[in-house]
Amino acid sequence: SGSCSLKTCWLQLADFRKVGDALKEKYDSAAAMKLNSRGKLVQMNSRFNAPTIHDLIYIDPSPDYCMRNESTGSLGTQGRLCNKTSEGMDGCELMCCGRGYDQFKTVERERCNCKF
């Protein structure tokens, strides 16, 4: 009869946090590579499994994010505030890069607009 059927597929992005966590995991397990004498990419450390098409690889190592580096735009971590009780990215152990850190307490007063 000349009629057409229309099928629409909708794709939705995954949760931003999940995407970020997955990328960070791949970054942390990326394989170091080098060019051999024939110009072919080979793995730097043959003790590890060869990377698959789903793995990240790199030739140049990442900069030291702990230190200020104007050429890469890294501000470093020196002088930043950290959270002593956190084991995450904002934690002092990770952020201070083994340099140690000073501790201090602050008292903050805020108007809470409480009504009694």
UniProtKB/Swiss-Prot annotation:
Lipid moiety-binding residues (O-palmitoleoyl serine): S1
GO cellular component: extracellular space
InterPro entries, A to Z: Wnt, Wnt_C
Residue positions with a glycan: N69, N83
One example of a Gene Ontology biological process annotation: canonical Wnt signaling pathway
Post-translational changes noted in the entry: Palmitoleoylation is required for efficient binding to frizzled receptors. Depalmitoleoylation leads to Wnt signaling pathway inhibition.
Subcellular location: Secreted, Extracellular space, Extracellular matrix; Secreted
Chief location of this protein within or outside the cell: secreted
Cysteine pairings via disulfide bonds: C82-C97
GO molecular function ontology, one term from the record: frizzled binding
Superkingdom, taxonomy of origin: Eukaryota
Entry keywords, A to Z: Developmental protein, Disulfide bond, Extracellular matrix, Glycoprotein, Lipoprotein, Secreted, Wnt signaling pathway
Pfam families assigned to the protein according to its UniProt record, in alphabetical order: wnt
SMART domains with a match to the protein in the record: WNT1 (SM00097)
Family in the record: Belongs to the Wnt family.
Its job: Ligand for members of the frizzled family of seven transmembrane receptors. Can activate or inhibit canonical Wnt signaling, depending on receptor context. Required during embryogenesis for extension of the primary anterior-posterior axis.
Name the record gives this protein: Protein Wnt-5a
Chain's gene name: WNT5A
